[in-house]
Every structure is written in structure tokens, then in C-alpha cells.
């Protein structure tokens, strides 16, 4: 089952409809070390960002139904490039951004990554939405807040995925989501798990809505 959505800003109503296979068509397009090396700005883009151990690659693979679209590493912080995945029906991209905060690299390199990430978020005009992934047990760190500040400055749509929700009881996960939602009323906040597929349908609906070009 998939969902059709009707939305104003980030307030979403969900309705049963036929399974939408669009995200399953996503395919790797290119990688870029900096904004200057990114492909030309054309269709809408949804960026995926989060701490280096937040599960970005696993989430991308789960949302697209592909086991190896994005590389999953046992070493947090291996995503050092800006990776573009084309979604054919939109002419746009899902963009896997370098993780921040935990990577086992020299501080100078870590700072360089953060500068490139900040420049991309601030200046990439076709970036219409941002999916911020946070471990449900440790949400809204200082670095997460900084990423959201970039998005707010651009008046960007934001989806907050509280990953690894299967690690908590249903009640604990619900309380964590409510706490974050109260702090971010302008964002959609979802519990999410690549293990038990919690939040997959709602997250897919949000992404498809903000990639359909209707708000460009």
C-alpha cells in the first residue's frame, strides 16, 4: 500500500491509493566533491543529511526498495562526497550529503566537509527539501540544529526522520517523536526504521510530493 498526499506547506493528509513505484526507479547519477562540481541545476532535489551514524544510506536504500543504491558502511563517516541519485519521473535528484559529527577523520578534513555542506545547503537553488535523519535516542543535537537553521533560512521544506525507532518501545518512540514535533512544528516528524519499515510510506509520500515540481 502507498499513499496519496494533499499538502499545504508541510501539513500532510494521507489517503490510500495504488502503490507508487517512482522512488524505486532512482539510480546513481554522479558524485561531486564540492558545489562547483555538482550537475547543472534543473529539476527539484531532496537532500538527505544527518550525523555520520544516523543511517542515511540505509534509509535511502529502504525508501527506494534497493539494497545497494547507497553504499552502507560499517564505519560512520564514509560518505565524503555529494552523491546524486536521479529520479526519472521528476527530472530531479535525491542527494546524499556527507555525514557530520562522528567521522573518524582529521579535524581539518572534517571542517572542510562541513564548509562544503554549508555552501551546498545555502546556494543550491534546486534544493527544495531537506530530510534530516537523527537517531531517535539522541535527536536535535547542536549540529542538527545548525542544519535546520540553513533550511529555515532558505524557507525549505523539512522532514525529520527519527531513525532506529525499533530500538525503543512503541511508547518511548511515540514520546520521542512528540517531543521533537513540539520543537519543530514547521516540520513533519516521523519515527523511522529500516529494520521494521516504520515510517516508510509516509516518508515516501512526503518526498514524492516535494519532488513533483508543483511548488517550484
What positions do the PLM features span?
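Short, well-ordered secondary-structure micro-motifs
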Residues: 39, 83, 105-106, 141-145, ...
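Flexible beta-alpha connector loops of hexameric P-loop NTPases
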Residues: 100-110, 166-169
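Conserved C-terminal guanine-recognition region of P-loop GTPase G domains, centered on the G4
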Residues: 116-187
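Glycine-/small-residue-rich active-site loops that bind phosphorylated ligands and cofactors
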Residues: 77, 101, 139, 168, ...
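Glycine- and Gly-Pro-enriched alpha-helical subdomains that act as flexible
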Residues: 109-112, 135
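Canonical P-loop GTPase G-domain recognition
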Residues: 23-35, 167-216
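Conserved G1/Walker A P-loop phosphate-binding module
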Residues: 2-104
